[in-house]
């Protein structure tokens, strides 16, 4: 495919960032970095250490010394903290409820941005997970603050109805009215909290918006690949499932 490719994908909760980003990475043989999982891992670590999440200085210090290892395989991404696989634990309701307190800490954001940029840069070298082919990185701030010079930058959006249904399926295994209602506060509160420290609801200059409200997963992956080809001028691969 030629030179290393960095693809940055941002968007609100439930827009499909993770599934689409993993799918794009699998199609193109790239590494996959879930920056949101890094904030969740930081939250797990702080709670594991017994930190008061309201103590911003203590939380920032804890995150600076956090022994975090991100597995970048899009077919099975992993998250380890201090040798513990926290991939399932960081998706718990406890972490989902607490993560905003960590993610809105500006010193934490600065530290995790540093780590994220280091991963992205490493994936442009032959020693990276994908052998220098590049990375798909997804999450808050990724298109504007973390990787504003990415080869392709996408803002993935969807209607509130579609986002709530997707997150309900993800968390509860169903998108019936009760599940959607149970998920609504968590999704909208996270977006509201994150909006105080990052811009992810309106595309910045050079960022292409893809609305997935009426698209299924494979169609959305195709749409993102089309954007990558459009903005890079590179044929990035066949348009079929992995």
Task: Name what the model sees in each region.
Residues 71, 116, 120-124, 139-145, ...:
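Small-molecule kinase domains that catalyze NTP-dependent phosphoryl transfer to phosphate-bearing small molecules
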Residues 87-173:
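ATP-dependent NMP and nucleoside kinases share a basic, alpha-helical "lid"
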Residues 20:
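Hydrophobic positions on the alpha1 helix immediately C-terminal to the Walker A/P-loop
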Residues 9:
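Hydrophobic anchor at the beta1->P-loop junction of P-loop NTPases
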Residues 12:
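P-loop (Walker A) phosphate-binding loop of NTP-binding proteins
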Residues 2-6, 131-133:
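Pre-Walker A (Motif I) flank of P-loop NTPase domains
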Residues 17:
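Conserved lysine of the Walker
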Residues 26-94:
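N-terminal phosphate/diphosphate-binding loop that engages ATP/GTP or pyrophosphate donors
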């Amino acid at each position: 495919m030629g030179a290393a490719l960095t693809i940055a994908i941002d968007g609100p909760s439930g827009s499909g960032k993770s599934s689409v980003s993993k799918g794009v990475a699998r199609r193109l043989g790239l590494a996959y970095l879930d920056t949101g999982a890094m904030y969740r891992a930081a939250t797990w670590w702080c709670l594991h250490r017994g930190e008061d999440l309201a103590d911003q200085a203590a939380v920032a210090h804890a995150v600076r010394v956090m022994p975090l290892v991100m597995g970048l395989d899009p077919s099975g991404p992993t998250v380890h903290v201090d040798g513990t696989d926290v991939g399932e634990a960081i998706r718990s309701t406890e972490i989902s409820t607490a993560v905003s307190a960590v993610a809105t800490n500006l010193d934490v954001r600065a530290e995790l941005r540093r780590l994220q940029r280091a991963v992205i840069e490493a994936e442009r070298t032959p020693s990276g997970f994908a052998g220098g082919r590049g990375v798909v990185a997804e999450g808050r701030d990724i298109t504007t603050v973390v990787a504003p010079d990415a080869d392709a930058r996408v803002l993935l959006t969807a209607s509130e109805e579609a986002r709530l249904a997707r997150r309900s399926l993800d968390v509860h295994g169903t998108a019936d009215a009760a599940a959607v209602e149970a998920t609504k506060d968590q999704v909208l509160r996270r977006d509201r909290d994150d909006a105080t420290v990052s811009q992810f609801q309106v595309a910045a200059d050079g960022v292409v918006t893809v609305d997935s409200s009426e698209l299924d997963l494979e169609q959305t992956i195709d749409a993102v690949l089309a954007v990558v080809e459009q903005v890079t001028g590179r044929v990035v691969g066949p348009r079929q499932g992995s």
